[in-house]
């Protein structure tokens, strides 16, 4: 008497495991930089909001820019902003995040020094006036 066996053979199971491994090898690198991109987005957003706050402050103070404490700006969680005003001529700011080594910079007008990035993108000028620029991933 012959019994019908049910189930998968070892070869079938190995093929499934190999297919899952290939899919994982494709998907994991795509999502590996997701957190890093989120940190950079938070820093860029804070720099844009800081620029708006600086301009509002300067319009109230007859064109004189202030640092982050004077203008009353608080960044997102984990983001540290260092603003260097140059009186009524301009200002610059550097944003860092506690969870990444990357940084973002911005300047407006004539700052005391134009900020530089440690790893600037090659496709654009390292820093353009009024436009937050970040290190590349």
Predicted segment positions?
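Short, contiguous, well-ordered secondary-structure segments
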Residues: 1-2, 56
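N-terminal single-pass transmembrane signal-anchor helix
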Residues: 2-31
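Hydrophobic transmembrane-helix microenvironments that flank and shape a buried ionizable site
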Residues: 9, 43, 51-52
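Short, intrinsically disordered, low-complexity terminal segments
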Residues: 21, 35, 90-92
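Aliphatic-rich helix starts adjacent to a transmembrane/signal segment
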Residues: 30-47
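Periplasmic/extracellular, small/polar-rich flexible segments of pilin-like filament-forming proteins
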Residues: 48, 52-137
């Amino acid at each position: 008497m012959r019994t019908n066996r049910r189930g998968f053979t070892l070869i079938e199971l190995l093929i499934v495991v190999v297919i899952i491994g290939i899919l994982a090898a494709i998907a994991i690198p795509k999502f590996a930089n997701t957190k890093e991109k989120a940190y950079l987005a938070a820093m860029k957003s804070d720099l844009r909001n800081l620029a708006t706050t600086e301009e509002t402050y300067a319009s109230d103070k007859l064109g004189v820019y202030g640092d982050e404490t004077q203008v009353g700006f608080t960044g997102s969680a984990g983001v540290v902003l260092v603003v260097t005003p140059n009186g009524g001529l301009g200002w610059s700011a550097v944003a860092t995040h506690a969870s990444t080594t990357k940084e973002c910079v911005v300047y407006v007008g004539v700052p005391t020094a134009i900020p530089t990035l440690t790893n600037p993108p090659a496709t654009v000028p390292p820093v353009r006036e009024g436009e937050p620029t970040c290190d590349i991933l």
